């Protein structure tokens, strides 16, 4: 899709399984993983903006929720709108919708910074959280290997359940001939960001180009918490310069009881 980029991170979604509302709120406080207003009109406006502004193709800032090892070049600006929704109730997660905007800017020296706005989920009270993020790529080899580190700071500003939180990660990727890219790394979330206690684990990604317009992708956060989801899907070129993402997030726990939902993302570059 960060900076965590979580698509920018540009930018990264989860679930306290104790109750569905807590689960979805925790999930969207995070994304790796970011909304302004939860009105459906925001989605319509954002989609029109995506179509209207001419942009160049750019590196992918996140896969879906897991940050990619791509970093924007200096002066490049990327924006994205993520739309998550579950159309029906289940015993684990009730129906909901969420809109998550983010913007990412390349600052040079293989560094990008971004801002995500999370916490607006329908139905329920707004719990808007500002999530500034940074990603740095200290290594990019001609052998296809890359290494990045990143950090997200969570600052709740409405209906605060905690004062501040943090997500830090490090990961490597390997790009093979034909374009296949595998990503693997580790993460740490501080208390209250994705669970009532600190959580650490692994984050993984897979990207396989099919042609110039379509790729099959998937990512996964390990762990039983509000970021613990496996999300497979596709990345596609909506137009010559606009990218769309369509995936389905499946929880690491209680999936058989309905802990899964749709995830759509629309991204574009301003330059």
Feature map (PLM): residue ranges:
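Short loop-to-alpha-helix "cap/lid" segments that border enzyme active sites
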Residues: 197-203
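Transmembrane beta-barrel domains of Gram-negative outer membranes and organellar outer membranes
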Residues: 58-192, 206-215, 219-271
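Cleavable N-terminal export/targeting peptides
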Residues: 1-61, 271
